Amino acid sequence: MTIKDLKEGQSATICTVGGDGALRQHFLDMGVIPGIEVKLIKYAPMGDPLEIRIHDYELTLRLADAEQIEVSDKKSDEDEHRKDNKKDKALVEHPGLGEGGKYHVKADEHPLPKDEILTFALVGNQNCGKTTLFNQLTGSNQHVGNFPGVTVDRKEGMIKGYPDTRVTDLPGVYSLSPYSSEEIVTRQFVFDEKPKGIINIVDATNIERNLYLTMQLMELDIPMVLALNMMDEVRENGGSIRINQLESMLGIPVIPISAIKNQGVDELIEHAVHVARYQERPGRQDFCDPEDHGGSVHRCLHGIMHLIEDHAENAGIPVRFAAAKVAEGDAEMEKSLHLEQNETEMIEHIVSQMEEERGIDRAAAIADMRFDFIQRICRQTVVKPAESKERIRSRRIDAVLTGKYTAIPTFILIMGAVFFLTFNVIGAVLQNLLGKGIDYLTAQMDQLLTAWSVNTVLHSLVIDGIFKGVGSVLSFLPIIVVLFLFLSLLEDSGYMARVAFVMDKPLRKIGLSGRSIVPMLVGFGCTVPGIMASRTLPSERDRKMTILLTPFMSCSAKLPIYAFFATAFFPKYKALVMVGLYVVGILTGILVALIIRKTLFKGEAVPFVMELPNYRMPALKNVLQLLWEKAKDFLQRAFTVIFVATIVIWFLQSFDLHFNLTADSQNSILAVVAGLIAPVFAPLGFGDWRISTALISGFMAKESVVSTLSVLTGSMDVIHKILTPASALSLLIFCLLYTPCVAAVSSVKRELGSKWALVVVFGQCVVAWIMAALVYAICLCF
């Protein structure tokens, strides 16, 4: 019997974990090991993937992967352990180790030089509050979400009040096995940068799974502290953790904190600075019990340590960590050690003997050794409530949001509400108010310049260039901020992870996994972070496909274009046209995905293995910070890139080839240059040189399409003369699909290289031309 054969709500005990390679190791690292109880929660609305509960957290996997995990009806002893823990809820005083700790021996101090920078690596599982803690430590405003893998790159900052420190926020990982790009980045940072200390943040509500990474970090023999986050939730749900007993068993300082409430952070900083300054390394790194299963794993690890000791020292890798990785079959580690053939053969002999004695394979044996140690710790130090309030709430919400018959309609309803409120209600009202304010300021400035008899050239620059150009873009700020507000709320609440779960099966039909939905949804806000979010995908194939498809998801910078032309040509159907453009972008992306799946990216999507976090109320501070960052970014672009582009466009439009001021813009430098490419767009219905100019400026920033047209035409009457409703709709389709802005192209280049960046630029222009020509031809038939 396998997990696939279980019924919803049925529990069983894992017997064997099949499969091979990095995926199997990833399963083991996440606690899917023999002897552990697993419960099938539900199937996705379309029947695949499924959701299981293991180690007190929810995990998703596909049916094909579930078939690889054999289970039996035998019950686990976990409930008995939980009952034993509830007998004593006595809390132990704190602190014990670290700064001010009663176990600290002053005579053993060997501090680093005072002028040496203390570097820290902030490491933790995905979705454990790591970025929130980083913001508290440094005062930064990094994006905080409730989706596994929000941190897609390492970020650095100085700890507040400690100018001689530098802390790096690394991507969330479940282990230091090289399965995903995040794990590779984290592992390489620790090996290459050699931080003076590690701050390991652990989700106290799910401590058992989180401690697996803690054990691997301790094997690195780097001074570290453990930040026990979300302790407020543990206490509220009737649980507790014996801090000093946990410290004693781990041999590192343990500090209870609540990152979101900024509780315990000051104490954490004191401990972290202390252990780094005095290089107080973990008190233990050996977690294998000599008596466990006849001591087979213990003998194996210590035998390997003896063989590779010199190689590990030469490679700068802690010998205990290296031995554990070699024992579990980490090929990258074996390459790093440069072992001789006879040494490799000896290690294989030692491992084979251990597997024979232990009765399971090498990777499962090492994972079981770690989880066995973790369970012993948790039985003695952790008092768990029966079920947390957050879990109960999440289960009730999921009954609707991921229900078999309600998930898809609810998703459509939620996204429809987001667009309706953005374009028709909140965003539209605020846009009208801001637009009136800008018009008033423009009129006042025009009167002032006229009263002062300012030179006509300068007058034209200020009014026709700056105010009309930049002002036309600024009026769309409310729509963009409102859209980001809703996307932020959906991500922070944990709903995005459910969307990935629900949409995995349909996305697999176009060659992607459910996790790809999140970068593409983020792309509706801005393509750049959407492309960066693809780094959380463990497959290089999926990552490339997702990056190439994300620009087809219409970003918020195109909203000014849609609103401008929809208002001008389709005022009665403004909302319908704008929503329709988003649908066309999605459908075009699907079509492109089907084509490249059969040509450039043959093969199957990466397995869908993802944690489903509990729903959480988005923190007002985090949401406001995100909105401020997005608004500030938009304003900076409006007063830098768009401002400069507007002035350049005005200059080229106002002077001829001999740099004489021209009254007729058709004789301008701009008209001559743009006229060379205008014929390319003639079959699409917008062969006017002014439209060509606006499209070129849109490569710098999409918002500048509107500002450029405002400068070149001067009034809406001129735009109605050069465009018909059919050509306007064709132009909207082209703007929707043609090359993304230079910032997005730069992101593609950074992620995939120059070749793929050029593919995006020219490929999307070709797709946009074909689709626009098709729409224009259809419109002419009616």
Positions of predicted regions on the chain:
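Extended helical scaffolds that flank P-loop GTPase cores
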Residues: Y278, Q285-W452, F659-L670
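Conserved C-terminal guanine-recognition region of P-loop GTPase G domains, centered on the G4
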Residues: Y162, R187-P253
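Conserved G1/Walker A P-loop phosphate-binding module
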Residues: E93-S175
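Juxtamembrane inter-helical linkers in multi-pass membrane proteins
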Residues: K436, Y440-Q444, A497-T527, K602-L626, ...
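Canonical P-loop GTPase G-domain recognition
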Residues: V234-D289
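Extended, low-charge hydrophobic alpha-helical regions
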Residues: E357, A364-D368, K384, A428-I466, ...
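Transmembrane helix-loop junctions at the membrane interface of multipass transporters and ion channels
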Residues: S556-V579, A743-L752, A772-F782
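Hydrophobic core segments of alpha-helical transmembrane domains in multi-pass membrane transport
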Residues: T410-L421, L483-S488, A566-A568, L581-I595, ...
